[in-house]
Amino acid sequence: ARVLTDDFLPAVEAAKAAGFNHFEAGGGARYQALYLYCREDAFDMMDRFRATVGPDVNLQTLARGVNVVGLDSQSSDVIDAHAKLFKKHGITTIRNFDALNDVNNLIYSGQCIHNAGLKHEVVVALMALPPGCEGAHTPEFYVGRLKSILDADLPFSSVCFKDASGTTTPAVVYDTIKAARALLGPDVHIQIHAHET
């Protein structure tokens, strides 16, 4: 996240020239790092990213539910302004998650994303428990969270199962996605995102 815009835009140009049409342009850490470490404005970076890839490329960022790009819960006016400002500065999709899978923390932020005219990629957060532990992190639990999203009538364009810890097993991912596909039908785009560091 602590990379100067001038240093990474040549790579974006090369990826665009190679035919890429979807980029993750940032998230909470990228937004914060520009101000805290790089002495750059996050909105200037978004504008330059958009200018580099052109008008037709999907630019995506990440939001932390009611925290949006902050580390604490934000007021409703800040959550709404976040969606509107990111739209204004060229973002087209926001992947919206709550690390504890509290659907209530996705409802207002997701509605703001949708109302701003952005694509809302709603997230179910995945992880594995330590060896020897049993509990909530099963395909049944994750599909239950997805059902809660559907029951909340939360508008979304796509669904992402996000494993930020990089610990979920392939079997859990397979069973979760298979059940989610049966629940969502064939037309909803499902994304799996994992941090495999």
Where are these regions (language model features)?
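Phosphate/pyrophosphate-binding betaalpha-module
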Residues: 142-156, 170-175
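A structural motif
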Residues: 17-20, 91, 154-156
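Conserved N-terminal beta1-alpha1 strand-loop-helix module at the mouth
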Residues: 1-25, 33-34
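Active-site beta->alpha loop and helix N-cap motifs at the rims of alpha/beta catalytic domains
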Residues: 22, 27-147, 163-166
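Short helix-capping segments at alpha-helix termini
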Residues: 52-55, 115-118, 152-154, 182-188
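Catalytic alpha/beta core domains of metabolic enzymes, predominantly
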Residues: 164-197
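Conserved, mostly hydrophobic/aromatic
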Residues: 15, 96, 159
